[in-house]
Amino acid sequence: MTAPFLQVEGLSKRFGDHQAVADLSFTLARGAMLALLGPSGSGKTTTLRMLAGFEQLDAGRILVEGRDVTPLGPAARRFGMVFQHYALFPHLSVFENVAFGLSKDADRASRVAEVLRLVDLAGFESRSIGQLSGGQQQRVALARALAPEPRLLFLDEPLSNLDPSLRERTRAELRAALKQIGITTILVTHEQEEAFALGDLVAVLKDGRLQQLGTPTELYEHPQNQFVATFVGRASALPGTITAPGRVRVGDVDWPTAGSATGAVTTVVRPEDVVFTDSGLPGTVVERRYLGGRALFRVSTAAGTLEIEAPMASAELEAKVHVTARRSLSFNRDSV
């Protein structure tokens, strides 16, 4: 069995009374892209800083290709970093920014040209930073991080400075470039769409603890707890009671459900798994949001509010309706 490229064992960090990261462990294969995803204060950035060597660990260790790099400083670890605000030098040209961390030898110009080709900025060497768009500046920062040939690349909220209209295209370009290079990458983001688009794997963090590590599909389809189920993607959470294996009662209606929970539960259901029906849980349409071809409805019921994705003509605002779920996930109420 091939040993992991990166092995993180029991990372912990406390700031005073605040446990920022607690006993975090995971492995990452060479060339994989991992997205650290979580709400504010979940420990994403602290984890990244510990891995990069900018923050001292209270406990744990970090191994790269089997070697313990925990005692090493940032430079000795040979990791690259793209900061949230890029940290480019506005008074220097693109070439000078990318070459900043390279030794002044005969290969410097060829290395700068090589990484600029990789990020699709060939011919931009003489331009100033002020002449570039936000997406181009992001790629200059990426080229500078790649120029010293790091073993591992870190991206801190890499697309947060871009307009929403640019993010989707830039995400695709960034992932394609990193996959072409084949560099192992860890990125921090609070945006689920960004994490799912860039990460081969996504680690969901909450209160400094790893909730689940898996592919985007695994997190969405098979969340391990209620937090992951409701944090990843859109979902409605309602109180229910398990009445039989694979069945949960919500209000006066039984739905199919998955999970090992018993007794009183919280049932989580995705908008695409809820349908309007002739008989089911009664409710009132309190919101109807056009999505283009379909709509997102919010239906208030005695058991709670459900979101439903359905054709726009399915129901009018304030209409009295009945709804049911084709599938759901149930969790014991202490599993949050």
Feature locations, PLM:
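The feature captures the beta-strand-to-loop junction immediately N-terminal to the Walker
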Residues: 37-39
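Helix-to-loop junction immediately C-terminal to a conserved catalytic motif
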Residues: 52
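Conserved coupling/switch loops of ABC nucleotide-binding domains, chiefly the family-specific signature
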Residues: 58-61, 207
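Conserved ABC transporter NBD signature motif
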Residues: 60-68
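ABC ATPase nucleotide-binding domains
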Residues: 76-80, 84, 88-227
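Non-catalytic connector elements of ABC transporters
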Residues: 235, 246-336
